[in-house]
């Protein structure tokens, strides 16, 4: 209780200091014809940002600033990040459009210039598990008071998604009116569906580096991140017939569970690359299910902790209902379906048609067109 009170006091002080500094930054800076892309998901550009930046560079007369940096775990790292935030605040103040792919404190708690537009493209194509305002007060969710202090997911002018079904979910998760959510899609869809041939080149490099992958079909296991829980991978590893299948394990970046080296692929190959390459994808509550469905790959859900996860987090999609034949608590049932080649593609098709309406290779283009509209209104 004391720790929570101290945290709340510290957050109020942080918020006040940021607003105080930002007030003077706004006073002494002018907006430029600038677009700033912000992220704290990673220290490097996501494929969504790479594709957006590439298209934005084709627009004459605009400046593009990209700032991607995770919040460090160390105390000294956090102190340095505070100074880095001031730099981000400057670029926000001098921009006409800001694009984000997750919660960013400087976007949500500050009061921005009226004509500056903020576009949230989120870092997931859809949401099987609940998040944001859907899980406030739950074990895996945010503290209600802290979410209120930090203005969680405030100030967005537009939130992009890939379907009407996802629009309903995002409206709850971001606590916003559906009119602010637009079905523009996500750039990553253009990438995995082969626009420009970039992913095919990546797969070729993968096979050149890991030649043993050429000889057998590949099973990819990519679960979601679980707070305060290390994954036990022994059952999965022992159950897969290594004589017949390659097994690749790709954990969430925040998951530090131990994975034997033989099942790992270098992180220069993204999870999207691995989905594209693999023949079968096993996940649980991860949003990679949507990319897998977009590629019409065999998709399986290994839900060994179903009851616990529903209670601590909650789900937007009842997987046992939607994927009756490929959702199970028993890994051997999945492997049996793979072995018998008896996958139900009709269930996958219904899921894809409901949750992904933007399979036309124009996702990046639609978002860029929206950015253009924002710039034109500001000129």
Predicted feature residues:
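Helix N-cap/beta->alpha junction signal
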Residues: 102, 162-165, 253, 285, ...
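Active-site and donor-binding regions of nucleotide-sugar-utilizing enzymes
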Residues: 34-196
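Membrane-proximal basic amphipathic "stem/tether" segments
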Residues: 1-42, 79-83
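A donor-sugar binding/catalytic signature common to diverse glycosyltransferases
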Residues: 98-105, 109-112, 117-122, 267-313
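A short, charged/proline- and glycine-enriched loop
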Residues: 27-36, 115, 214-217, 244
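Catalytic binding pocket for nucleotide-activated donors in carbohydrate/polymer assembly enzymes
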Residues: 255, 260-261, 287-355
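C-terminal alpha-helical cap of glycosyltransferases
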Residues: 360-379
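Conserved catalytic-core segment of nucleotide-activated headgroup transferases in glycan assembly
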Residues: 44-55, 173, 181-260, 328, ...
């Amino acid at each position: 209780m004391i720790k929570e009170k101290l945290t709340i006091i510290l957050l109020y002080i942080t918020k006040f200091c940021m607003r105080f500094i930002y007030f003077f930054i706004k006073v002494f800076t002018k907006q430029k014809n600038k677009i700033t892309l912000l992220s704290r998901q990673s220290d490097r550009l996501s494929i969504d940002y790479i594709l957006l930046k590439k298209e934005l560079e084709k627009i004459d007369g605009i400046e593009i600033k990209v700032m991607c940096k995770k919040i460090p775990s160390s105390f000294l790292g956090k102190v340095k990040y505070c100074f880095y935030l001031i730099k981000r605040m400057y670029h926000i103040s001098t921009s006409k459009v800001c694009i984000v792919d997750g919660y960013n404190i400087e976007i949500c708690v500050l009061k921005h210039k009226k004509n500056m537009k903020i576009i949230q493209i989120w870092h997931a194509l859809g949401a099987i598990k609940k998040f944001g305002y859907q899980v406030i007060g739950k074990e895996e969710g945010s503290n209600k008071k802290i979410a209120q202090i930090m203005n969680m997911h405030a100030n967005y002018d537009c939130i992009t998604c890939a379907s009407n079904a996802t629009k309903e979910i995002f409206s709850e998760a971001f606590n916003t009116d559906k009119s602010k959510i637009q079905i523009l899609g996500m750039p990553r869809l253009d990438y995995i569906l082969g626009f420009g041939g970039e992913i095919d080149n990546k797969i070729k490099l993968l096979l050149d580096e890991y030649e043993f992958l050429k000889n057998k079909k590949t099973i990819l296991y990519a679960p979601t991140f679980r707070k305060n829980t290390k994954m036990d991978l022994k059952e999965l590893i022992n159950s897969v017939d290594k004589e017949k299948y390659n097994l690749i394990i790709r954990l969430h970046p925040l998951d530090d569970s131990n994975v034997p080296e033989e099942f790992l692929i270098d992180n220069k190959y993204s999870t999207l690359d691995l989905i594209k390459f693999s023949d079968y994808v096993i996940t649980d509550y991860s949003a990679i299910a949507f990319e897998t469905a977009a590629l019409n790959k065999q998709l399986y859900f290994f839900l060994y902790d179903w009851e616990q996860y529903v209670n601590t987090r909650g789900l937007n999609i009842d997987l046992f209902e939607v994927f009756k034949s490929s959702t199970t608590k028993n890994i051997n049932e999945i492997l049996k379906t793979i072995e018998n080649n008896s996958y139900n593609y009709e269930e996958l098709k219904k899921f894809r048609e409901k949750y992904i309406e933007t399979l036309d290779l124009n996702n990046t283009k639609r978002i860029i067109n929206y950015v253009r509209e924002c710039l034109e209104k500001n000129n």
